Structure formats: structure tokens, C-alpha cells
Amino acid sequence: QKLCARPSGTWSSGNCRNNNACRNFCIKLEKSRHGSCNIPFPSNKCICYFPC
């Protein structure tokens, strides 16, 4: 199943530096399949992955 990336709507900890925390946020709070930190300049974002 294809997953589509979407910035977390609940991440409020500023720059994302902890993949495990981001993944837990996405799975538990946003009901996504996966989550990880995306590192584009100028800020790191927590990205959640949902079924498309």
C-alpha cells in the first residue's frame, strides 16, 4: 500500500530531532502508519505517512 507524506498537525516541539518521538506522535495522535523527521532547511519537520 502506497503511503503519502503529510506534515504532522500535532507536533509542537519545534524542530524535529527525534525520529522515535515523531513516529510515536504520528501513530498515536494522528493514526498514521509511520512518522519520521524530515530535514529540509531551514527547519526540521515531523512528517507523518498515511495511506494514499
UniProtKB/Swiss-Prot annotation:
Disulfide bonds join 4-52, 16-37, 22-46, 26-48. The keyword Disulfide bond applies. GO terms for biological process: defense response to fungus; killing of cells of another organism. It holds the Pfam family Gamma-thionin. InterPro entries: Defensin_plant, Scorpion_toxin-like, Scorpion_toxin-like_sf. Keywords: Antimicrobial, Disulfide bond, Fungicide. Belongs to the DEFL family. Forms oligomers in its native state. Possesses antifungal activity sensitive to inorganic cations. This is Defensin-like protein 2B. It comes from Sinapis alba (White mustard). The lineage of its organism: Eukaryota, Viridiplantae, Streptophyta, Embryophyta, Tracheophyta.
